[in-house]
């Protein structure tokens, strides 16, 4: 019968196993997607109905209008662990509420300046247009965003 000292000598160092696992671990970003109810969310439905495959890294939040997305929602998403955020709006001129998507564009521009102040790359916050009939475009935007955020790596944000 072996004594406990000889058993321990033959066991691999668990600390090195953890470090090896971290090196081989593939980064899968967490992305929050804010989708307009009238266009982008319907585009997502179309993609789903057509059984289009896209990255599961995006958690969708349906909003009635992209113009109602408060910049604080985006900051909260990053503060709570999101590596990226998407805002998907109606195409210009197609907003159900007339001007909501224009308001969203203006807020996004201001938000990018704010993110820069916090050291967050602007590529982590994508704004794009997807209409109700653009299921394929929805899939492309999702997959492009996930790949862009993967290249950036995990968001390193300092919490208070």
Predicted features and spans:
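Iron-sulfur-associated redox domains of electron-transfer enzymes in respiratory
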Residues: 1-160
